[in-house]
Amino acid sequence: HVFRRSDVARLRLTLREGLAPIELHVVHLDLYFFHDLDLVQMNLEVRADNLPLATVREILFRFGRAYPSGWDEEGEGLHNVYLAEWLGADGQVIARSDSAQRTKYLSFVCEHRSPNISEHWACLLRPLVLAHSDEVGALRYRLIEYHRMPVMAYIAMDQPRTLSREDWIRTGLATMLHPDEALPVNVPWIAEFEKRYCQDRYWTNTASGPNTRFISTGNAMTVVGDADSRFFLDNERGVLAQFRHQYFLVFLIAHLHRASLLVFSEVLVDAVNDLDIRNDVSVRRFKRRIRANFETFLRFTHRYWFHELSERPHVQAIFRMCARHLRNDALYDEVRSEIREMSNYLDSDSQRRQSNTVVRLTVITILGLIATVTTGYFGMNIIPFGEGSVLERILHGLIASSIFVGLVLFAVARSKRLSDFLEAVSEEKLSFSKKTRALWKALLGKEA
């Protein structure tokens, strides 16, 4: 299911303290619910015109963080925007960020061992409320990964062919590189930038074009093209339309795979942490959670997990690049192995319980065989049950039934020890005295 919120019209960002705020238009704000997977993904699209490239990179780096990654000496949040404000159609502020409230975030983490999120993001998600918060809400959520949100960027710029290699790197890796830091030219992912992250099927670097470059790091996808190209700007049939409706789905599916696998892994961890092997209720709850998680994983594998997404080689290459950088295949193998181990544990535990049941039934059968042979030898009419009054026969039946039930229950209670005794009897190397001690232990529960 997809739910759309329409009361948020604009986003006002103050990137750093003292800078003039920037207003971006909110195109749409959606929540994607995957009920099968207990997963929610938020999709926010904003746009702006005539921004400097440096400002675009700053927005990509600072915006889209669920909570501050730290605080500076003045108490302001690190790496996030100084202030983010959601505005309604009438210009009124709906919510604003609170990254400077350091105590709020730290106290929440200390109490719940889970991160809090900034107020402007929490406002967008209401009536959903954070899992450990004090807010009242029927639906609760929690982050399944770190604070950096996946981001897609569509950049139409004048003369993209004039960009230097450093500009390309800083634009494509804007979410990873701090705008004020020098470029780390010696690290492999910078030296191999074009090979690792660029898909240049539609980049010719010629005057006739096309000059559209796709850059994917897994957590971010950036499409850069020529602002003078009508096809690049066409929102019905051009690259912009493909970006919104096709490449968005490619990016969404790749992150759906990763998010789902992280959910499965987290459910396993929670189930193990909640397990108390000395508590039967906890053990039964653990088994139910593991089996339910296994069933959901099977549905995910057959419904959502696939590698071939499109017949177009370029789209398929983009999808594979995203999935490779997100390590989806390795994560899938890891989660599948964990679930298989849990399933094998439950199967072995069930087999152990069945074996114990078979042992008990075997002991009871042997005791019943003794009783059957004995009564068969002496005949079934030793006691004239058919004679006497009706009351005497009823009383006789109740007493006999009570005795037999008591013997069966005693045999069940001592079945493990009686099984050990039968094993001792079948052992030819044991002496008669040791076999007698085994019988004594089976009946009384202690050594002779």
Where are these regions (language model features)?
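Extended alpha-helical interaction modules
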Residues: 16-276
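Alpha-helix capping and helix-coil boundary motifs
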Residues: 50-59, 164, 169, 279-282, ...
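Generic serine detector
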Residues: 6, 69, 97-99, 107, ...
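Extended hydrophobic/Leu-rich segments
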Residues: 190-193, 295-298, 315, 421-425
